[in-house]
Design a protein with these regions (language model features):
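Short, charged/polar connector segments at secondary-structure boundaries
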Residues: 1-81, 88-89
């Protein structure tokens, strides 16, 4: 993490998946394993998001986001980054 990047805790309901996500399939067993780890240890590495209107779109960390929801979490650590669409395509 670069200096000056603050970690905030966002409600999962305020986060949307990235419409440019190249991964179309998430391995269900691996997600369940990650969810179990998150239940035990929490999310160790924050996801990276950008603000889009009144929501936050995932730039990196969709597996952590999905596993956190599966684990029953309501918030996730995140770093808010101001990117436009170009680097996401």
């Amino acid at each position: 993490m670069q200096s000056g990047q603050e970690v905030v805790y966002l409600h999962l309901d305020d986060i949307i998946p990235n419409r440019f996500q190249p991964r179309e399939v998430f391995d269900e067993r691996a997600l369940k394993e990650l969810a179990a780890s998150i239940k035990e240890h929490g999310v160790i590495q924050p996801i990276i998001v950008r603000q889009v209107n009144n929501k936050y779109e995932i730039i990196a960390g969709e597996r952590r986001y999905k596993a956190s929801a599966l684990a029953g979490m309501t918030k996730i650590p995140a770093i808010i980054n101001n990117l436009d669409d170009k680097p996401l395509k």
